[in-house]
């Protein structure tokens, strides 16, 4: 049994993307994973997702679009201020303006681009490109 459900979700998406699958199953489901999937959908990395209750913690069925080259969870979860986002972009993303970092802020889960516009710091959760 795994401890980090977000890492498992990102690995499941990455593996399904690499073998060319159209759908991926993520279990167990959580609100955090749902919010991360919503950000990924907003930026076009996945087509959509659906929550299914199975009386074992639920699961998400994710419809993949084939736009993900790499994705993963960031461990340990670094706290970041607005001025530090660029440092983490250089570390986790391959090029400037290519991909997103997913951040948990006081206003909810969003990309680092939205957090920078709203001048919010937060905790880094994942990267996608």
Swiss-Prot record:
InterPro entries registered for this protein in UniProt: Ribosomal_uS8, Ribosomal_uS8_CS, Ribosomal_uS8_sf
Keyword Magnesium assigned: no
GO molecular function annotations of the record: rRNA binding; structural constituent of ribosome
Organism: Archaeoglobus fulgidus (strain ATCC 49558 / DSM 4304 / JCM 9628 / NBRC 100126 / VC-16)
Taxonomy of the source species: Archaea, Methanobacteriati, Methanobacteriota, Archaeoglobi, Archaeoglobales
One GO BP: translation
Name of the protein in question: Small ribosomal subunit protein uS8
GO cellular component terms given for this protein: ribonucleoprotein complex; ribosome
Record carries keyword rRNA-binding: yes
Subunit structure as annotated in this protein's UniProt entry: Part of the 30S ribosomal subunit.
The protein's role, per its UniProt record: One of the primary rRNA binding proteins, it binds directly to 16S rRNA central domain where it helps coordinate assembly of the platform of the 30S subunit.
Domain of life of the native organism: Archaea
Matching PANTHER family: 40S RIBOSOMAL PROTEIN S15A
Family label: Belongs to the universal ribosomal protein uS8 family.
HAMAP family for the chain: Ribosomal_uS8_A (MF_01302_A)
UniProt keywords, alphabetically: Ribonucleoprotein, Ribosomal protein, RNA-binding, rRNA-binding
């Amino acid at each position: 049994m795994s401890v980090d459900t977000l890492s498992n979700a990102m690995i499941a998406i990455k593996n399904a993307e690499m073998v060319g699958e159209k759908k991926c199953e993520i279990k167990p489901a959580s609100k955090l994973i749902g919010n991360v999937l919503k950000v990924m959908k907003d930026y076009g990395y996945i087509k959509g997702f659906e929550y299914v209750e199975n009386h074992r913690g639920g699961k998400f069925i994710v419809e993949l679009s084939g736009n993900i080259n790499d994705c993963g969870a960031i461990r340990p979860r670094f706290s970041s201020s607005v001025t530090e986002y660029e440092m983490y972009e250089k570390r986790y993303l391959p090029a400037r303006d290519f991909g997103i970092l997913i951040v948990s802020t006081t206003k909810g889960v969003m990309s680092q681009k939205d957090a920078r516009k709203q001048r919010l710091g937060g905790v880094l959760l994942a990267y996608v490109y």
